[in-house]
């Protein structure tokens, strides 16, 4: 999307006014997917194009962007070059676990944005083809997000069909709580992980869409204290 937008910028002044009109541009997708196979996808845009967009487009539209989709490679350029005062929806696409975790722990710009502005968040963690994913990392990332995002309403956490990223809370010592989250989409390892989410931790949850990797006998019991839960899909 953004590469097409850039191709129309600076054609004429009148055309710029039309293309960059705040009535039309509210969502900005800073990815460009190249699909080698169903499981092998690249989301990065060309470096030269990225630089031009950050220099020529973002300063002109940053104040009107409500929704932003950004991948790991362009994160530094897009998030750190300019602020987005109207941004409330953020999608972080194709991130490595460790890099995403570092952003959540150490990057003050990202932490401030999540804490003060974001109400809708999508997280896509890329598959590790050289080693098994560290599922405890995912549970830590999940807990950090709930802790940081004070006004989070909707969260899509690693719920993408072409990914194998699965979250588990079996080994986690983190305490996942949110008093604002109403919609959660997530992939988990076992039914026990599902039970973990259905207690007082997410007391405002009304919609839970969950993929459970392993459906097996469990000693746990469903103690659903999420009084507002009206939709449960697995």
Predicted region positions:
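Eukaryote-biased activation of long, low-complexity terminal tails and linkers
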Residues: 1-234
